[in-house]
């Protein structure tokens, strides 16, 4: 499959730079996987699409203020984007500088350059950084870090983003990008879902900066996925199996929940799904056999991204690309702070490839 198969025209004006004033007030485009039928509505319509006993699976990762500005002690300006916290004093990070720091280089971080750190080693594209500070890394980031807004949101981060670029149920710090489908759930909507008898379970996948890396190969089968840490605990496995046994739907909130659940299914030897704690590089594109998920809540993704490939594998290539063309025509808002889709599984999607 060619990368260009997943391209579509997107006017700049449809990229959302700020979220809706009310989380659950965004628009919702519903795609019926088997037929391709589209329905336009608002996000709270989700209440009517779910039945008592259906299971929503959320990603409870919490975005850390992972972007740091500063300079090398030798002079040059740097920008550090923390990819992963290794322990209380060490991180793996991307570093932007006119000249990459060498091992042993001293870094002065923070707008006032008050935090001292050392670049200790390089691991391919990532740099290992040791903070020379008594405080734990997370405290330092909360103190001097900036929220790592996606590259297509072309504005500096604001204080409000610390709350807005975060799901209301986020718990475990470690992501450098929000699991954005979850941004549309506010407490009143969660309360109404619970009142209807909708079950909820929480996986953790710490979204890495790699989620914004463009696919750089023409043939998508050659793409190597970035690695992210995921946790699917026993209680999630139990909830999934119980929902399936009842004949209810398992609904993933966001592509990160999809990737967590499907990683846990791939790792299960003879069961449908088993607990999973570890790094995943799962790459889902047309031809992939979904094992766990019956429906998906997700935002609108970038052209030629691995995420539009994941959706195509779920709903079918033609239905997906048609839905995106319709969304552009109807002026839905795209990407992280944009509108949402609700998609049901198309069992025929596995047999469909672009160009067929």
Curated annotation (Swiss-Prot):
Kindly list the places in or outside the cell where this protein is found, as annotated in its UniProt entry.
Cytoplasm
Listed under catalytic activity are:
7-aminomethyl-7-carbaguanosine(34) in tRNA + S-adenosyl-L-methionine = epoxyqueuosine(34) in tRNA + adenine + L-methionine + 2 H(+)
Report the principal subcellular site.
cytoplasm
GO molecular function ontology, one term from the record = S-adenosylmethionine:tRNA ribosyltransferase-isomerase activity
Alphabetical list of Pfam families matching this protein:
Queuosine_synth
Could you list this entry's UniProt keywords, alphabetically sorted. Answer: Cytoplasm, Queuosine biosynthesis, S-adenosyl-L-methionine, Transferase
- InterPro entries per UniProt: QueA, QueA_dom1, QueA_dom2, QueA_sf
Record EC number: 2.4.99.17
An example GO BP is:
queuosine biosynthetic process
Q: Which pathway is it part of? A: tRNA modification; tRNA-queuosine biosynthesis
| GO cellular component terms listed in the entry, alphabetical order | cytoplasm
PANTHER family recorded for this chain?
S-ADENOSYLMETHIONINE:TRNA RIBOSYLTRANSFERASE-ISOMERASE
Give the family, as the similarity comment puts it: Belongs to the QueA family.
Task: List the NCBIfam families.
Answer: PRK00147.1, queA
Q: Which purpose does this protein serve, as stated in its record?
A: Transfers and isomerizes the ribose moiety from AdoMet to the 7-aminomethyl group of 7-deazaguanine (preQ1-tRNA) to give epoxyqueuosine (oQ-tRNA).
Q: How does it assemble?
A: Monomer.
Protein name (database record) = S-adenosylmethionine:tRNA ribosyltransferase-isomerase
Q: Which organism is it from?
A: Cronobacter sakazakii (strain ATCC BAA-894)
Q: Which gene encodes it?
A: queA
